[in-house]
Amino acid sequence: MYDSIKKSCKRYSFELVMCGPFPLTEELAKEDNVRMIIDNGSPSRCAQIAAINADGRLLAHLVDDALFIEDSLDQCVDLYDTVCDKKDVINLRYTEALNFRPTHMHKDYWYAWFHGPLKHTGVPKDYKIACHHLIDTEYFKELGGYDCSFEYQNFNLHDLMFRVQKDGGTLFDSPNNVTNCDWYPNGMVDHKAIEQAYVDNDEPLFAAMYSDPDVLSKRIYIELDNWKQTEELWSRRFSKGVPKDYNEILENN
């Protein structure tokens, strides 16, 4: 993945900031522009911590099961500097299929109401989504970033983009796809905790929140340090303690 990032971003400097329970591999530890912050919290908590510690002018939020397309991030930064004001965001379009196979995503996929779980009265029908996004780092922090009461990174990504749009920002689609993401049709062994978080907490929380037609008028800005209100040890994942490595996670699920 790191090698593909370098090919996607040749003309601009970048830093890869990650957060999670395990240290960097020997190979990544040799790279000057890669940082790992150790934390045992939920995916949302870790993403928030990583984002807060980002130093760059722009913040790109993406996923780890992705391969970056050559020159794609360069093109997105070019577009950002051409069309975006501080409150605007680039939707880093992606494909998702088994073994990173490029696929076509319907143009309506990038609109909230294309997705059943997002069809609530508090979500305007013309709002767009950007699970992978390029945003001004300081503006991200002013907004408060991700709401970490959502444990997994899905609904709080939508929530952030809805808050951006309510605040007057525009979501511009990337010129081309930025990543090809992997997809597992039968789920993954290590995704049990994620599925539980999605079903038991995040989806009902989002539904309750956005059933209010005025929700966005009340919560454009949230506390940046909201991650501190979450579990330091994510109990869904680490009920038996923190494993020594990723293989132990697979064995215990």
Segments from the language model and where they lie:
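Acidic donor-binding/catalytic loop of UDP-sugar-dependent glycosyltransferases
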Residues: 66-79
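Aromatic-glycine-rich donor-binding/catalytic loop that engages nucleotide-sugar donors
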Residues: 135-154, 166-167
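C-terminal catalytic/acceptor-binding lobe
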Residues: 153-253
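A recurrent flexible, glycine/aromatic-enriched loop bordering the glycosyltransferase active site
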Residues: 115-135
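Glycine-rich, basic loop-to-helix element that forms the pyrophosphate-binding segment
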Residues: 38-54
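Short, acidic, metal-binding catalytic loop of nucleotide-sugar glycosyltransferases
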Residues: 2-13
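Short beta-strand-to-loop acidic/aromatic patch adjacent to the donor-nucleotide binding site
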Residues: 57-67
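Short beta-strand-to-loop element that shapes/binds the nucleotide-sugar donor at the catalytic cleft/hinge
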Residues: 90-106
